[in-house]
Every structure is written in structure tokens, then in C-alpha cells.
Amino acid sequence: TLYESWMIRIERLSNGTVVNTTPEMQAFVSKVNNDKGHEFTINIKKLYENLSLGYLYVDSEVEIMPGKPLNSAKQLGDIDVLLINKNTKQIVCIEAKNFSESRTVYELIQQNRKIVTKELSHVIERDVWCKGNIDKFKFYVPEIDEQYSVKTIFLTYHENAYKYFEHERENDIIFLSTIEIVDNPMNVFV
């Protein structure tokens, strides 16, 4: 029906999954996706802030680039949510992605392809940099020493497709969905 067609269109617009063939529509979809991503990141940060744990440092959108506290030789993007646990001596860098839920096998394959070809290489590069530059995190938590470790979590709102496929390239990135941290936010430190 016309109503159902309209509702599908609205859903695709709000999810940022509508087919975009014009520059204006591409810009609109990009803005929708950026807004969704920012809101998701802020909500993950709030989840950890609301725990009110004195030993847990929480920050978001922490840039890794020349001239910033996490000073790197080149622009490496940002850590969406940075958690530093003083008790377990862990630095957890969360890459938060609010992908639309995959409903078909084709969408699962497409999501996996997007993660592998567009997202993961940047996350791995950032993870390697963070592991090699633990001392730079002292800007945020001065107590950081050589006993601290770093891990990166690729967090998606819905369960993501990546873990259901075999991949040629091994990496240290941990893949979680929000359901796994809402039940137990400290899951990221296990």
C-alpha cells in the first residue's frame, strides 16, 4: 500500500540506508549517519559515567593526531569512548558504530564487507598506535605506568556480522554489541 511504502521510505531515511544517487541525498544520508553515530557514542559514554566509579576514567571522542594530548605523527581519527580502569590497569578504546540491523543474508554480507574494507583497517592502525604509546595516556590518568595494557573494542548497537565470517587477516580487536555491555558494563575489562 501507499502507507507501507511511505513508512519503509521514512525508516530508510532515518536509518541512513536509503539509496542515494544525488549529491544532496548523499549529504543528507551522511548527516543522518553522523548524527546517529554521535548520539550512540554519547550514550555509551553516559552508560559508563552513570556507574560513578571513582577508579574509572571516562571520556569520548579523544583525538589521536599531531598537536593533541595523544600526539601522533599523523591523523589517526578518534577514540569514540575511552575507558581507563585504575583497578585492573586497563585502557579500553571503544570504536562505536551504530550500524542498521542486518535483516537478510545480503545485508549481513554487505555489513561484513563494509567493516573489512572501510572500517577495520583504521581501527587496527589506531589500536597498534595506542599499544605502542601507553605513556601518552598519562595526560588523562597520571598513574598510568608500564603495567597498563590496551585493548580495542569494536562496539555495534546491533550484533554485527563480522564475527560470523572467516577472515584472512587476524587482529586483536574484540567485537561486542551493546546488549553485551548493557547487561554487564564491566564486560569490556574481562
Q: Where do the PLM segments sit?
A:
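Intrinsically disordered, low-complexity Ser/Thr/Pro/Gly-rich regulatory segments
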Residues: 1-190
